Design a protein with these regions (language model features):
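Bacterial N-terminal signal peptides
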Residues: 8-18
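Boundary at the C-terminal end of the N-terminal hydrophobic targeting segment
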Residues: 19-23
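Short coil-to-helix leader/linker segments, especially the first N-terminal amphipathic alpha-helix
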Residues: 60, 70-136, 169, 316
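Short, surface-exposed loop/turn motifs at beta-strand boundaries within globular domains
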Residues: 135-140, 251-253
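Beta-strand elements within well-structured catalytic alpha/beta cores of enzymes
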Residues: 139-153, 287, 421
Length: 445
């Protein structure tokens, strides 16, 4: 019962990630023997669809004739599951999409075709509101989990695959652990993911915007995109910003995660920077000032947009080395004088992501070597060299879980912070298959 009272958990299914393009069929498509295991009953379906470029058994997304999900970032309404806190303060009658004044406050203007007096959906900035409310309610642990690219339709597909049963066609659903968990008070809703704008150009070295406001505004037309995630979609290309009659900005991971973590709509590519170029503070740093321990755990490179927005500031999501400096409490291009305090725990990927030169994206202070974590950063924070972080990283011949557990134990014993750096090419964790293995049908080279 103590855990139920003290924990707030927000599970965010995000529509942000694009999909792999359909593969061209090879001269002869022979499925690898490793994928023919009877425990992986979907391997043949996936292999045939990947190499034919189409799936006769079904589709979702904007291209029915292709084996592809949504082919771009999108503005789909995405599910939000909460545990330990409700949605009454942000959804339904409290939806900001029912109010002109609240829409102006969120977007900085009144977006065209966006006001909806009947909206049940809330805004992605309200995910920040929920975390603030959880802290104010006395919750001692707040967890925000983001599944980048997993929307309502793919969640339902996974539930069908797991259970072998089509159990629902609307609402929260059933069949997956987070849908059925009843160990704490729980709620279900969905939010709009539109950004403030797209097309803002930046100067990474100066940490300045060249054209505040960009060239394309955000917004959400319910008549085009639907009132719920399971509604039939009038115009699928609208949701990916490719409708000629309603051109609009679609959200990327940086703008969306800034909204989740700092409660501010912004331009695509921004890491906790508002549309005018002003830095904003994510809730992790706000709570850290109040004595909270804060951290981020990710299956992608540590400074990628979503984990970066938990803590850092930068005008560009691609300035990886500086973003990592913010996350571990070193001076950076965005905090040149007094560095940020740094996260207590940082666990993620990016190991081996070497690049001789990435200065075009990361600016004049780019260091050759790992493009995600600069060599000088690892040296400066290493507890064995007088730094504040116990470093656990991918080690040849060792299981990552064992290396990480040993590092965590050493950090606890020594009163140190923890950095876990793992991953495979191109920097992420390996893909897990439905049967628990690590031999996906489609492997990126």
């Amino acid at each position: 019962m103590a855990l139920r009272r003290s924990l707030a958990f927000v599970l965010m299914l995000s529509s942000l990630a694009g999909a792999l393009p359909a593969a061209e069929p090879p001269p002869t498509a022979t499925i690898p023997a490793v994928s023919l295991r009877p425990t992986d009953r979907f391997a043949r379906l996936q292999w045939d669809a990947t190499h034919a470029g189409t799936a006769p058994w079904g589709h979702w997304g904007d291209q029915p004739g292709h084996y592809i999900s949504w082919s771009n970032h999108s503005n789909r309404l995405v599910p939000v599951y909460t545990f330990g806190i409700g949605l009454d303060g942000v959804a339904g009658e409290q939806s900001p999409y029912r109010s002109e004044d609240r829409l102006r406050a969120i977007y900085g203007r009144l977006p065209e075709h966006t006001l909806n007096p009947a909206a049940d959906y809330f805004d992605q900035t309200d995910v920040h509101t929920l975390q603030v409310a959880a802290a104010a309610a006395g919750k001692r642990r707040i967890i925000l989990m983001v599944f980048d690219g997993l929307d309502w339709t793919t969640t339902r597909t996974a539930a069908i695959a797991l259970s072998g049963n089509v159990a629902y066609d609307s609402g929260r659903g059933t069949g997956l652990s987070f849908q059925d968990y009843a160990g704490a008070p729980t709620a279900f809703g969905f939010c709009c993911t539109s950004p403030a704008n797209d097309g803002t150009k930046v100067d990474v070295d100066a940490q300045a915007l060249k054209n505040p406001g960009g060239d394309k505004a955000g917004g959400y037309d319910v008549a085009m995109g639907g009132a719920t995630p399971w509604d039939p979609i009038a115009q699928p290309t609208y949701l990916i910003g490719r409708d000629r009659y309603r051109p609009h900005a679609v959200c990327d991971s940086a703008a969306s995660a800034t909204a989740f973590c700092s409660g501010r709509k912004t331009y695509n590519d921004a890491i906790n920077v508002d549309p005018a170029g002003k830095q904003v503070e994510p809730i992790a740093r706000t709570l850290q000032k109040q004595g909270w321990a804060v951290g981020t755990v990710t299956s992608v490179p540590i400074p990628h947009a979503t984990p970066a927005c938990a803590y850092a500031n930068n005008v560009s999501r691609d300035d990886y080395q500086d973003i990592t400096r913010d996350m571990v409490g070193l001076r950076s291009v965005s905090h040149r004088g007094e560095p940020l305090p740094g996260l207590d725990v940082v666990i993620g990927c990016g190991f081996g992501g070497d690049a001789p030169d990435d200065s075009k994206q990361q600016g004049v202070n780019y260091e050759p070597g790992n493009k995600y974590v600069a060599p000088s950063t690892l040296a400066a924070i290493d507890a064995e060299k007088g730094g504040r972080y116990r470093i656990a990283q991918r080690t040849a011949g060792r299981k990552g879980a064992e290396v990480l557990a040993e590092g965590a134990a050493a950090a606890i014993a020594g009163g140190e912070r923890l950095l876990g750096l793992f991953g495979t090419k191109p920097g992420n964790l390996p893909f897990a298959t439905a049967d628990g293995g690590y031999d996906p049908v489609l492997v990126s080279e």
